[in-house]
């Protein structure tokens, strides 16, 4: 059986930027929501400085939490870093949008600062800055083949379109904190989390049950291997601008806190019972990435490193570790 280390983190573009830039990011999101009405908690957090005080606190928590993950990852020294994240029309668009895709190339590039929201970044890096990561090609091909033979209808790609940024931000953004040096071989796995939310030409997202089953199939493959594999679930949980039960104006604290307790207590498999409509209403589209990881890791209690539930961030952010 492969040795496993689990990591959970967020990937929102603001995590790459100084807190002084967060307000502008919020304003871009608010503008997308027709008749946007800020919830009372957001107004309180904005205070008299348009949220800067809250943003400074939250940004430091994000950086510190990633430092904990990085320290554990590098001390553990995996043979493979499997990052499960969603591609938001960065490589997969209406012409080809599978529910799941395994990357099988020998290497992959990422341009994390090419996106306008990350031009003003913590590293002072130029927009064209490129990061190249080597990938475990033979391992990825073996996993792809095993999953398909195990009943997972899985796409694979040995190159990315990545018109502007290569790796999706769900993968490259966490890597800027975890392993920008590319010390460990990277295996990207892509999930269509947004589904029809992106428009009528996009197919529905896979169900939570199916995502958990894919994770279990991955675990069955890993049971035949001897590598040390770090499994990274990359996403925030509920997003205010996707939470339809709140007219896309507020994060779903009640649902996220309930789900967090299940993950904390080692009952993550319960999340597979969520319905597609519950995911849609709560704005928890990206939770599907975590559900796949939970399928791999099994019902083990998580060490919760940090939780950010400020409405100023527009999403509920959890940082977690699993020692398996």
Regions from the PLM with identified roles:
Residues 1-76, 98-213, 224, 243-324:
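Flexible, D/E/H-enriched segments
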Residues 79-85, 189, 227-237:
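Beta-strand elements within well-structured catalytic alpha/beta cores of enzymes
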């Amino acid at each position: 059986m492969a040795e496993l280390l689990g990591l959970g983190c967020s990937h929102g573009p603001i995590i790459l930027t100084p807190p002084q830039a967060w307000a502008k990011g919020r304003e871009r999101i608010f503008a997308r929501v027709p008749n946007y009405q800020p919830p009372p908690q957001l107004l309180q957090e904005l205070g008299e400085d348009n949220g800067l005080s809250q943003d400074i606190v939250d940004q430091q928590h994000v950086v510190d939490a990633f430092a904990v993950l990085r320290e554990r990852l590098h001390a553990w020294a995996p043979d493979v870093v499997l990052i499960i994240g969603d591609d938001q029309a960065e490589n997969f668009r209406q012409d080809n949008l599978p529910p799941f895709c395994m990357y099988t190339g020998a290497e992959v590039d990422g341009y994390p600062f090419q996106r306008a929201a990350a031009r003003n970044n913590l590293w002072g890096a130029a927009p064209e800055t490129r990061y190249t990561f080597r990938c475990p090609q033979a391992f990825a091909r073996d996993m792809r083949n095993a999953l398909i033979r195990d009943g997972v209808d899985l796409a694979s790609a040995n190159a990315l379109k990545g018109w502007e940024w290569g790796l999706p931000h769900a993968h490259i953004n966490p890597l800027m904190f975890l392993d920008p040096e590319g010390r460990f071989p990277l295996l990207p796995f892509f999930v269509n989390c947004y589904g029809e939310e992106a428009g009528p030409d996009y197919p529905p997202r896979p169900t939570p049950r199916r995502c958990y089953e894919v994770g279990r199939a991955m675990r069955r493959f890993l049971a035949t291997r001897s590598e040390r594999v770090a499994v990274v679930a990359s996403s925030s949980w509920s997003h205010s601008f996707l939470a339809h039960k709140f007219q896309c104006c507020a994060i779903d604290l009640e649902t996220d806190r309930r789900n967090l307790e299940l993950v904390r207590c080692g009952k993550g498999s319960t999340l597979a019972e969520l319905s597609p409509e519950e995911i849609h209403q709560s704005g928890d589209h990206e939770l599907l990435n975590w559900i796949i990881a939970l399928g791999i890791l099994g019902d083990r209690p998580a060490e919760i490193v940090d939780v950010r539930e400020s409405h100023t961030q527009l999403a509920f952010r959890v940082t977690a570790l699993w020692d398996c």
